[in-house]
Each structure stands twice: as C-alpha cells, then as structure tokens.
Amino acid sequence: MALSQHEMFEKLLDQLDLAADVRQDPSLTSGTVQNVTIHEQSRRYDFTLGFDAILPFQTFNAIATKLPLVFQQIAATDLSVVVTQPTITDELLAQYWQYVVTHAEIGTGIVRELCEKQVPTLENDRAVIKTENEQIRQYLIQQGLGKLEETYRQVGFSGLRMQAEVDEEQAAQSMAAFQAQRAEETAKMAKAAAEVVKQQAAKQKQVQTDGPVQMGRQMKMTDAPQQMVTITQEERSVTVEGYVFDVEVRELRSKRQLLIFKVTDYSSSFIAKKFSNGPEDEAMFARIQKGQWLRVRGSVQEDNYSRELTINAQDIQTVSHPDPTDDAEGEKRVELHLHTNMSQMDAMNPISDYVKRAKEWGHKAIAVTDHAGLQAYPEAHSAAVKAGLKMLYGVEINLVDDGTPVAYRADEPRDLASAEYVVFDVETTGLSAVYDKVIELAAVKMKDGKVIDQFEEMIDPGFPLSELTINLTHITDDMVHGSKSEVDVFKLFQQFCDGAIMVGHNVTFDVGFLDNGYERHGLADIDNPVIDTLELSRMLHPERKNHKLDTLAKQYKVSLEHHHRANADAEATGYLLYALEKEAAKMYGMTTLNQLNDRVGAGDAYKAARPSHAIVFAKTQAGLKNLFKLVSLSNVKYFYRVPRVPRSQLQKLREGLLVGSACSNGEVFTAMMQKGEAEARAKASFYDYLEVQPLPVYQPLIEAGLIKGEAHLKDIIQKIIKIGSELEKPVVATGDAHYLDQHDAIYRQILIHSQGGANPLNRHSLPDVHFRSTSEMLTDFSWLGEEKAHELVVDNSNLIANWVDDDITPVKDKLYTPEVPGVEENLKHDVMTTAHELYGDPLPDIVAQRLDKELKSIIGNGFSVIYNIAQRLVLKSNKDGYLVGSRGSVGSSLAATMAGITEVNPLPPHYRCPNCQYSEFFTHGEIGSGFDLPDKQCPKCGADLHKDGHDIPFETFLGFHGDKVPDIDLNFSGDYQPIAHNYIKVMFGEDHSFRAGTIGTVADKTAYGYVKAYERDTGQQLRGAEIDRLAQGDTGVKRTTGQHPAGILIVPADMDIYDFTPIQYPADDQNAAWMTTHFDFHSIHDNILKMDVLGHDDPTMIRMLQDLSGVEPKSIPTDDPGVMALFSGTKSLGVTPEQINSKMGTLGIPEFGTRFVRGMLEETKPTTFSELLQISGLSHGTDVWLGNAEELIKQGIVTLKEVIGCRDNIMMDLIHWGMEDSMAFNIMEHVRKGRGIPDDWQKAMRENENVPDWYIESCLKIKYMFPKAHATAYILMALRIAWFKVHYPLIYYTAYFSVRAEDFDLAAMSHGKEAVKAAMKEITDKGMDASTKEKQLLTVLEIANECLERGFKIKMIDVTKSDSHNFLIQDDHTILAPFRAVPGLGDNVAKQIVAAREEKPFLSKEDLANRGKVSKTLIDYMTTNHVLDDLPDENQLSLFDGLF
C-alpha cells in the first residue's frame, strides 16, 4: 500500500534526524509531503510540505537546514511550505525576517542594508517596511519587495502582501546620502555585469560538491592551532581548528557568494567569513556543513556590523577529528545509569545521541534512566531499533518509606506523661557516623516537664577541628583539647541514660554516632526506647514546610539561645517534646509509648519522608506495564514537590522489575557514608543489584565535607562491594551520564545555574558525568585492581543487561480503536433512516449509490466507531442547545450528514420536498450550491421545496479508495467544550479517557537568556558566536509538561491506559481537571484514537443570539436578500461606508470581517452562497487569489463563480467537463498541494476541448487550497450571525461584545461615536507602533462605532444592574456594559461584585471596595465616569441601626 502524505512526511522526519525538541513540536502533527518534483538533469528535488499553521521558526529552520544535508549526496534541494490556516503575527514576521532577507535573492546592497536594519510590522493585514524617502521606497519596490513577499509565501505566509512606506522624519537628512550611494552602486553593477559576461564566455571548471574542503594554501598539520579563547584582539593572522555548528552561504548582488560559518574548539567560538572567487570556491562552500571539523587561517578583525571579532578566512581545509572511541579489548560495558534531555532541566542529549555513540563503540545495549519520568521511551525505542541495539527501559525514582517511625524499641505501654526522659544532642566533626567523631555530648534528664539532671562533656577527637566545624558548632580546639576520651564519655552517658526514654531531634543522626562509637569501643548496644521529635512533629503536622529545631522552638515559644550547641539544643528539644506529646494526646489520644507509631504511614506520611534515588528497570513486557503504573502513581497519587514512589507500592508492583541502589543519593551509599556498614547492609538487602560510580562523580560530596577525602571515598566503595559479595548481589559500575562528551558539561552548568538556589546542585561544583567508554571506566576503577575493575565495569553490567528480555517495546505497532457493540449496524441504521426521511424510500439512485459507496468504505475499514463517537458528541451538544460546526472535510461525507455529524450536504445541488420526499438534482455543474436555487413549490404536492447540496466529492475526505483514517474535527462552543470533553468520560469511562499530553522544552530564546544570565553572573564576556553555541546546547531540554487544548485520547475497553503510556497531571498541577498522557501524544498518535473536540466562538455566539431572540438558528434562510447585500455594500445596515469606514457591511462577520477579505469583496461583489464559498476558498488558499484569480477577474477573462476557489471544485469541474474520475481526483490532489500537474495529465486536459487554457494555467500557480466542506460549514455559521446583524442588530452587538470582544475602551464607547472615532484615530495614527492589544482594541472600536452609527447606545456599567461578563440589553436602543469591560477589572472581581450585590445592595464606595474586593484605582475610575454618583464615600450610621 502506498504511503499517505502524512506517512511520507513522518518518514522524511526520520531521515532528517531532527533534534528531539524539534521532532516533538506539536505543529508537525499535521505535516504532509504534498509534492516532490524531481529535476533529473539539474539534480534537484523540489519539496513542498503542508501544515495546518505557520511553523515556529526554530522548527522550520531545523527542517530547512537538515534537508540539503541529508540529500547532499543525491541532489540539491528546494523547500516550499503550504499552510492551510496561516495566522500571521508580528512575532512570526520578525522570527522569519533574517531568513527571508537571506534567501530572497535581493539584487542590491542598498536594499539588503535597509532590510537588515529593521523588521517589518503587520498593519491592516500587510507587512510594512519603512523607508527614509520616496526614492528608496520606489527602489525597494523595484529591487526587493516582490522577492521578499514571494519568499515569505514560500515559507508558509500565504496571502501576505508587503508594502513600503516613507518615514517622513528621516527623509530630508537621508536624500543626499542615498543618491550618492545609488550612483556608486550603479557603476559597480555595470562593472559586475561586464565581469559576468566575461566569466560566462570562459569555460568553467566543474568541481564536485562533495568531498574534503581545501581552499587557499595548504596548511601544515604539524603546526598547533591557536586556542580560540586566547584570541582577544585583532590579529593579522591566526590559525584555529574547530567544529562547525552553523553555516550559511549568501548570494551577493555581485553574483559572488559569501560564506559565513560558526566554528568552536570548545574553549570559545568564532564567526568566520569568506568571499567566493569563482565556481571552485562556490563548490567548496557547498561542501562545508554542520558537524565538520575545519582548520581555518586568516586575519581577525572587528566586524563593522556586529562589532565583534570575526575571522576573515583565507585558507580553509578539512581536518580529521575522530569521535571518542572505546578501545577496550573484548566485551564492552553497558551503561545502566543514563539521563537524557527528558530529565527535567538536568541533562542535555536526546537518547538517540547516546544510542548512536554506543553503537559506534560496539556496546550491545544501553539504558535510559531519566529522573522520575519515561518520556524518552518512544525515541529510545525508535533509535534502538534503527541501530540494532538493545534498549533497557528504566527510571530513576524518588523512593520514600511509607512512614518513618516516631519511636524505636517502643513496644511497652509506658505512660508518656510520667516517664523519665534523657533528651540529648551531639556535636560532631561532620555528618558521617563512620568517619567523623563526637566532640560534645550533652543531655538533660527530665520528668514531669522539668529538668532534673544534666550531662555535658567535651571529647577530644585527636585531630584539629576544621573551620567548617568551628563555625557551625562554635567549638574550638582549645575547648576540646585535654578533654575526656570518647570511651570514657560514652560509658558515663550509658549510665546516665539507664532506664530512661532517650529523645532527640532527628535522633537517628545522633544515635548513629553513638551506635558506631559503642561498637568501636566494645560497649553494649543501646536498648533504651528512643523518640524522635522531628518525626513526631511531622506526624502531627504534615502541612508544615519545615520541622527544623529553631523553627519549632519559635512556634512553641521554647527558648533556644545557643543553637548548634549540644546543651542548648538538648534542653530545647526536651520542652518541645512535652508540647508535642500534649498535641498527640489531644489529636489522636496517644498517651503511651507504644501508641506513638500507630499513625506511621497514615495519610500523607509519604510527604514527610526524605526521598532516596533508586533505579528501576522493566525486566519483561509485563514489568514495563508495572513500571508505567508505578510512574503514574508517583505523578498522580504521590506527587509532593517531586514524584514519589512509596516502598510499599514498589513492592506491590515489583513483578517483572529490577531495582538498583542508584547513586550517592541512594540509600545504600548514604547509609554507608553516614551510618556505617550494618545500616548499609540492611538497606542493600532490598535491591537486586548495587551501584558504584567513578571517583570524580562523588567529588561534590568531598567538596561539601560529607566525605573527608579520596581515601574515605574508596573505603565506602570497597565496603559496598564487600556487602554485595556477602549478600550475593552483583555490584556494577555506572557512569550516571548526563551528557555525551566532556565538553558538553558547560551546557548543564548553564542549565543548573538558571535554576538558582532552588536547585541544590548549585551549591557546589558539578561532577564530570559524561558518557564514559569501557576503557575510561576501567581506568576509573583501576585502583581496585584489573580483575575487580573488569568485574564491576564489564561483567556485571552485561550480566544485568542479560537479565532483561530482548523484545520489550514501549510503543504499539498499530492503531487501537475502542469497540462499541453493534456500532456498524447502528450507524447504517441511523444513516439510512435519516436518508429515507429526507429523500423517501426507495432512495433516488444518486443518494443510494453515494451512501452505498460511503458505508462500504466506513464499515469495511473499521471507521464506524469514529463516526459513532462524533455523532454522539454532536447530538449531545445539539440536545443541550449548542450547534456544532464541522472543520476540514468531514462535510464531504453524506453519511456524516445523515448521521447528524455535520450540517453540510455534499450531494449535488437539489430540491427536496419535506412533505412527499420529491427530489430534483442538478448534476452538471450548472448550479454552484443548492442554497442558490430559486424558491419553488413541489410539483407533486405543492409544498415549499427545501434547497440543499454543495456538490462535494466523498473522495476529498477518505481518499479515492475510501481507506484513509477519518480525521473528524468538530467546533463546539467554547462554553460547551468542557462539557463535551467530559461527555467522552461518560461514554468511555474516566479510566479510558485522557487529555493528550505535551512536553515543553527549553526554546532557543529561553536558552539565550540562560546563557546571558550565566555570562553576567560569572563575570565573563562571551563572543556572540559562543553565546549562540551555548544556547544551542541548552535547547530541547524538558522544562515542563502540558496538554493539547482539544485532543482527547480514548482507550479501548479491553485495554487500559498503561498498555500505551503512563499518566500524570499537566505541569504537575494536582488540581487539574484532566489527567494527561505522560508520553507526548505525537509519539503514540498512531496507536490510540484521538478525538479533536475544539472550542470555537461561532457556536457560542449563535447560542447567545438564539437565547436573546428566540429565533431557531436552523430556521434562518441562507439566501436572505438583506444579508447578501452586506457582501457588496452597507445599505442593509442603514449607514454609509463613510460612517463606518468600510465599503462592505461585514465588520464582525466571521470569515468576512478582515481588511483583506473586505478588499476581495469590494473587487468581486458576491451575491450568492456559492460565490461566498469561492471567497472563502480564495482567501484561505495560497496563490489562489493573489496573482491568480484576482488577475483573471480584473482582466475580464472569467467571473468570480468561474475561478478555482476550493480544492473540490477542480475534481468536480473536470468531471463535469468529461475527464475520467480518477484522473480528476489525482489532478485535484496535485494542485491543492502545490505539486503542479504532470505533463501527461496536462496533455489530457489540453486535449479536452471543454477545459479552458486559463484553467490549466491557474492550476499551475496554486500552492494550497481550502476544502469546500470546511468553507461551507464556516459560511453557514457566518450567514446566521450576519442575519442577526441585519434583522436583530441590538441583539447582534450585545452578543458580539459578550462573546468575541476582549479589549474595551469603555469610556469612549459610552461617550458616543465621536469619542469612539477619536480613540480609533489615536490607534491608527500610531501605525506600526501600535501594540497588539491596541490593534485588537481597534477591531472592537470599529464594531462599537458601527453600533453607535446605527443609532444604538453603549452604557457605562451600572453597579446595581451590570452582569459580571455579558453585555445586557437595557432598552430598545441601549446596551449595558458588564463589569469585566472596565479596564483592569478581572473576571474574579467582576464575579465578586455580583455575588456581593446579590447578598445586599452596596451602601457606599467603602462597602463596594470591601465586599466587592474593588481596588482604589477601580473606585476612582468608576467615580470619574459617574458610576457611583448615588453612593456616599463611607457607610453612614443611622440612629435606628440595631434597634430592630
């Protein structure tokens, strides 16, 4: 089966191998390969790609850059983009501007210089460039404007018109300079032209465009290049060597080329430039591509434009720069701990980079273990399959205990109130009970809330105290020198504690030092009960943000004058204990020792636990599903600051999983570092394997003082290896990779720096965590001996990899749609029942044949359930009083019409009798739309005939063979959209309905900001090229998650969501109404059904118009003369064009209100529905109107109804003219995608005497065409709204301002039309300087002006009557504004005012401010505009208040 255009596009994306953030851009979802024209002689491929909307420039540029690279060995490439619904903004214009200027082949330097100095702005649907005077404006129009406009259109800005305007302020001072420059340029052009003639006469040497680069003189490879970072000033000659990360070749007006490339040696970066001298240089320019290593020699000069040092290259040549290799002999290691750019704001490279490197190194497998997420899995699967590598699917979870005990050895029911306590605290030389020493031990003995004895001893550790210890504890060497020995103090303390309950704050820390000390000296283990006040506080108050001793002391008013001295801390902890015990007794009835642990693990106990890292792998396919469930639980049920996995849940889902001890943040390493071997052994028993990492990875722990030095670090690692041996668990060496190469470390450093103090990694230097080779790892662990190093690095990593099944896949290989019993029969029944009701039984042949063809395709290909879901959603919305508009080509399906999914009838134009089902069809194209037929009575029964049918072929929806998966997009009212979404839950269940998830990554501009902040905070001055390199390195990293605005995924009843993806809340918002897919929905688009349930203003407005008027929208005629007159003038409105500043009466009418479309209406004056369809198609298409139909109409060749408007017209026109159906369809498909018409089809068209030549030429110009069904649905809604504008104007304006308007100048609107006109003029006078908000306001003011000119009034808000959101009709001529129309008054305040008013009337401005939550600024606004004239400033007391 031939690939669909979308499938071809997906295949192209795979070939382009785009960066993950680009590949996951939601705008690529609609992508299609519309055409590829192959020019065999010139070896050029012309690609035409199609999208729904203009691509973000970063995405477009990535495709445009990659395309020639991928095909460079085959052919040159050219790229055009066709966009179905282009929404052009100032931001998009600016983002594409430099690309457009570079690729527009502008002929003169003056024009290029002018363009490079400014960016066009959008004014009245045109892109405007300002010039200094009229001469330059004319010169720009002659030399470059058309090329700029055409280049914009080629990249998707269909319909964009460019305009040059004179900036009068600069005109006088610039005239002389311009004339001199033009004279000079004219002379240069003449000289250049002569040179071109001379060159063309000479025989040109042909040079291949592939192979090594060699330009200028050969450079000696023995000469060492200069480090870029050392070049800080202009120099006559430098030689550098580096990696090319950006390249551009510009065509100059002199016909020479300018090569500009950015190169880095990772110490810094440079821009290098070189001008061509003939075709040999140009061929060499073509060889220079991103990813190459070049040696460059030239001068360093300050660039006149950028003011930065730039290399003017004289000599350039390719140098060999081999990628890192893994030269270890024999079997290679497997990396089992690896983070990709899906580890949120923490790691750099996509998994595909690691897979490529692992394959090159000969590794048989590789793991992915991102922080708390699995979002790299789809890409990992694709990359691994492509490389033939085994992928190990894992995750680094945040493991927490379900609850930490409050008390230890607490089995006896000892009465807490009367118990005797020893509250103690230790001060130490560090945090490790294994490697640090106690230097102070203090305690108080308490009973009945009073101190009855004290213990305080200093201990000499036998070595000088560190500065950190002295500063933290305020204990000096003099204070401990000559003190008692550790063993003596411990013996005394054991006696002091005899029989008492021991108490401490974070007591496990203190007990750990005692346990290790007692063991070290052969003393008896602690057997006293122990209470931890830290955990007691957490158990009682999980809502508190911290439970530090000093924080709690303040809350409970306990004195703590010398915090971090043992005696002070001990006494404060004692008094805190009594306060907490009283709360425990009051809250939970805890009065005895054995009751303190009753609530361990209850409620939100998981929030109080400190997370530890652990690695979890899916060992089997069933294990992968358990992993999906585990990650879902952590994101949905156990999310607190980070996704958490309670140990009990991991145990419950452990089947098919492998659990490893992870990094230094894992509990085994932490226990070994801080508590000792016994504790570490107990923790290690939980895991399937243990992990250790290279010494440099632990460097931050040494820097922080948590580990005293490398000797202690090695001791910890050796003891973990020993524990593994004792427990018979493999110990494996992992790299904890966060980026690919060592030079990538700077990208992570910048990323972490951007997060400030919120990220604990900012407190110390970052470790070296690049992707290490086997040989590197063996070197890192060589201190263990060759045999042991090989065991940890190679043997055990492969052993664990072998534990995992080979055939695990996280992505399905086909589409799974929900099954609805009897759906095929029900659909057929509904369709045929409606058809018989409308057209009789038996059906007319044309209807019966059409339905038979459609139903065979729909049912035969399993599409019935998709129709069924859409049908149920639409019927539900209609029942609830909201019409639904269809989008796209679903109106091409008569079955969809008969099922009630769409109002659009695709049959040929026809009459239909609602009484006796008589019908009469017009099948030869003589009528464009059934709505245009003249009124007529039924010849059989005399009833008024209904008119319908728009002649739309079914093939435009499901393809010529009817086997294309239907994409049914529906426009629900924006108000009703949430209800429609929730109805899917009703239909399929909450566990089978999910919002489509998205992943937000660091964008290029954001990354640029990170780099600039890093530059500022580190006191550096980076070159622009280096900033660009660093920003490139940080783009694409996961920042957050989100949700598709309309997409709902439906899981089949016999499956669950974990068969496809984990789930989560968007952006970790635990209060979100919907859960989303954890995977970006694009990655599972082909596996699970997605319904696009969109929100739109038109159905909302129709509902409001119906509510206010009582008129049923479907009863509104489609050929009302007054409505049709709006499209050719303003007479229907009772105003002149001058009054409303528009020659057409379509302001505020969907599809027809913009200046661009109003201009089309002025030229064409449509009078029928079919002509309005033409306008819709012409305005949405690319190269359909401008330079095409517009010219044909102007020249009088054809009329509006004859030109090609919508794509479907082509197929139906050609069929009506006698061409074969399949050829007509194929020609339509080629033309609508901008692919032209192949020669043999053109020949067939020209041989058909019915096909006009102008028609063929028009087809050849078209780049994109709008579907007729889409246009029909939109215009049907537009005509209904327009009908109210003509016949119920006050209702229309009330609905428009309520539904469509967001920005208001209420003061102007309420003061009348002169004030509105003045406000409009103020905005229009700003021209290009007007803000986006002002331009949006201008549209609202235009409607307000029209409303006022028609004799209506807009009233300022009334505190006693206004609604919070909607405008209200006050009388036959007046509309009352809502509170939200007041500038700066948001929806919440508006609702609060109405709620407070309903409780009781406002007594004063003070009362309004207090109960309505209205700010002083808003009170002042209302006062100024006389809203509050009847209210005093303050509440006034009455003599009789309170007497009754």
Swiss-Prot record:
Limits of the Exonuclease domain: 421-577
MF terms in GO: 3'-5' exonuclease activity; DNA binding; DNA-directed DNA polymerase activity
Swiss-Prot/TrEMBL keywords: Cytoplasm, DNA replication, DNA-directed DNA polymerase, Exonuclease, Hydrolase, Nuclease, Nucleotidyltransferase, Transferase
Cross-referenced InterPro entries: DNA_pol3_alpha_NTPase_dom (IPR011708), DNA_pol3_finger (IPR040982), DNA_PolC-like_N_II (IPR024754), DNA_PolC-type_N_I (IPR028112), DnaE2/DnaE/PolC (IPR004805), DNAPol_HHH (IPR029460), DnaQ (IPR006054), Exonuclease_RNaseT/DNA_pol3 (IPR013520)
GO annotation, cellular component aspect: cytoplasm
Main subcellular localisation: cytoplasm
Localization per Swiss-Prot or TrEMBL: Cytoplasm
Keyword Cell inner membrane part of the UniProt annotation: no
GO BP of this protein: DNA-templated DNA replication
Enzyme class at the top of the EC tree: transferase
Catalytic activity from the UniProt record: DNA(n) + a 2'-deoxyribonucleoside 5'-triphosphate = DNA(n+1) + diphosphate
Family named by the database record: Belongs to the DNA polymerase type-C family. PolC subfamily.
Function: Required for replicative DNA synthesis. This DNA polymerase also exhibits 3' to 5' exonuclease activity.
PANTHER family with a match to the protein in the record: DNA POLYMERASE III POLC-TYPE, DNA POLYMERASE III SUBUNIT ALPHA
Protein name: DNA polymerase III PolC-type
Originating species: Lacticaseibacillus paracasei (strain ATCC 334 / BCRC 17002 / CCUG 31169 / CIP 107868 / KCTC 3260 / NRRL B-441) (Lactobacillus paracasei)
Gene: polC
